[in-house]
């Protein structure tokens, strides 16, 4: 039976394709927009049955051109939180997603899609409930509005709808994302280019490099998606983070120590890295004051209640694996 992955040449989409391949699934239609042509590299080691441009796909899918489709993993979106073109964002993230959803509902196809923790905006609690949702940018609003649609249609849906609010995802196949790539990716490249990693200094009561995020490995993101794929009776909107807030200092020290280990050098504590100039703190930029989240942490209550009980990688585990993967790509 056919599977479809939108955003298949993107970061999370390509990792889902690869994870499906590792289970023997190759009857996959990959959907994307390859105007940014270098994204093709994310699919070079993957097996797919067909590729379609996103515009052609949604029209053909609505006509049921692909026969029986078991599931759509809808990862395609504009994920640039700095994008200011509201019309583009709403067309790409909201209207397009509605069209894919409508086709899935009409055909009884499982619909697993990418939501975002950006929906929470400046909230201090990260629970999948309306009172904690207050997006700060049009990207977050586009995701929020679609989740609101999902809440309205889910009670009457005859097939699975599962949305995942991704927190700070890092891992292989993100190099095309540029400024929107993970901190781990940028720290890796910065250390190799300059011999040091730069982090923000003290801000809003947090010490240098102590601002925290829920950093989640794309490996775990793919596992959660496949868990729900395997349990089509489970529907809902779920936080998808490690459930653990860790400071940016943890990312930096892990990147530095993993690269040192690859060169046969011993690990250093954060204090030693700072003393040796391997980690440097820069003044917090004025442009980000009042617009910056100093803390995020996914509430996993709903995810665990839905039956996902596997542990999530820590920063130390996941970033170490990722740095070794990046090093192997050089």
From Swiss-Prot:
EC top class named in words: isomerase
EC number: 5.1.3.20
Keywords, alphabetical: Carbohydrate metabolism, Isomerase, NADP
Catalytic-site annotation from UniProt: 139, 177
Keyword Isomerase found: yes
Binding site for NADP(+): 11-12, 32-33, 39, 54, 75-79, 92, 143, 169, 177
Keyword ATP-binding recorded: no
Catalytic activity from the UniProt record: ADP-D-glycero-beta-D-manno-heptose = ADP-L-glycero-beta-D-manno-heptose
Obligatory cofactor(s): NADP(+)
GO MF annotation, one: ADP-glyceromanno-heptose 6-epimerase activity
Cofactor: binding details: Binds 1 NADP(+) per subunit.
Top-rank lineage group of the source organism: Bacteria
Pathways per UniProt: Nucleotide-sugar biosynthesis; ADP-L-glycero-beta-D-manno-heptose biosynthesis; ADP-L-glycero-beta-D-manno-heptose from D-glycero-beta-D-manno-heptose 7-phosphate: step 4/4
Single GO biological process annotation from the record: ADP-L-glycero-beta-D-manno-heptose biosynthetic process
Binding site for substrate: 168, 179, 186, 200-203, 213, 292
Function: Catalyzes the interconversion between ADP-D-glycero-beta-D-manno-heptose and ADP-L-glycero-beta-D-manno-heptose via an epimerization at carbon 6 of the heptose.
Domain commentary: Contains a large N-terminal NADP-binding domain, and a smaller C-terminal substrate-binding domain.
Summary of subunit composition and partner proteins: Homopentamer.
PANTHER family the record matches: ADP-L-GLYCERO-D-MANNO-HEPTOSE-6-EPIMERASE (PTHR43103:SF3), NUCLEOSIDE-DIPHOSPHATE-SUGAR EPIMERASE (PTHR43103)
Entry similarity comment: Belongs to the NAD(P)-dependent epimerase/dehydratase family. HldD subfamily.
Entry protein name: ADP-L-glycero-D-manno-heptose-6-epimerase
Top-level taxonomy: Bacteria, Pseudomonadati, Pseudomonadota, Betaproteobacteria, Burkholderiales
Name of the encoding gene: hldD
């Amino acid at each position: 039976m056919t599977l479809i992955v939108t955003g298949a040449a993107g970061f999370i989409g390509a990792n889902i394709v690869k994870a499906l391949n590792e289970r023997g699934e190759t009857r996959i239609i990959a959907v994307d927009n390859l105007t940014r042509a270098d994204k093709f590299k994310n699919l070079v080691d993957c097996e797919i049955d067909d590729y379609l441009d996103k515009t052609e796909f949604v029209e053909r899918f609505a006509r049921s051109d692909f026969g029986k489709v078991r599931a759509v993993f809808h990862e395609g979106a504009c994920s640039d939180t700095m994008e200011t073109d509201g019309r583009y964002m709403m067309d790409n993230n909201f209207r397009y997603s509605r069209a894919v959803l409508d086709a899935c509902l009409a055909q009884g196809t499982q619909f697993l899609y990418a939501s975002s923790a950006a929906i929470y905006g400046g909230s201090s609690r990260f629970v999948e409930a309306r009172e904690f949702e207050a997006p700060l940018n049009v990207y977050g609003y586009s995701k929020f509005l679609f989740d609101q649609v999902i809440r309205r249609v889910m009670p009457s849906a005859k097939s699975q709808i599962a949305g995942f609010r991704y927190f700070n995802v890092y891992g292989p196949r993100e190099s095309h994302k540029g400024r929107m790539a993970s901190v781990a990716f940028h720290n890796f490249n910065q250390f190799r280019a300059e011999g040091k990693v730069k982090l923000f200094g003290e801000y809003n009561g947090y010490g240098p490099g102590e601002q925290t995020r829920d950093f989640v490995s794309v490996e775990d993101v793919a596992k959660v998606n496949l868990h729900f794929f395997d349990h089509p009776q489970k529907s809902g909107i779920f936080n998808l983070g490690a459930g653990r807030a860790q400071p940016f200092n943890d990312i930096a020290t892990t990147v530095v120590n993993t690269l040192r280990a690859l060169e046969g050098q011993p690990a250093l504590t954060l204090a030693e890295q700072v003393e040796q100039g391997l980690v440097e703190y820069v003044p917090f930029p004025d442009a980000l004051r009042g617009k910056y989240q100093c803390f995020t942490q996914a509430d996993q209550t709903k995810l665990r209640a839905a039956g996902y009980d596997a542990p999530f990688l820590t920063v130390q585990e996941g970033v170490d694996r990722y740095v070794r993967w990046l090093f192997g790509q050089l």
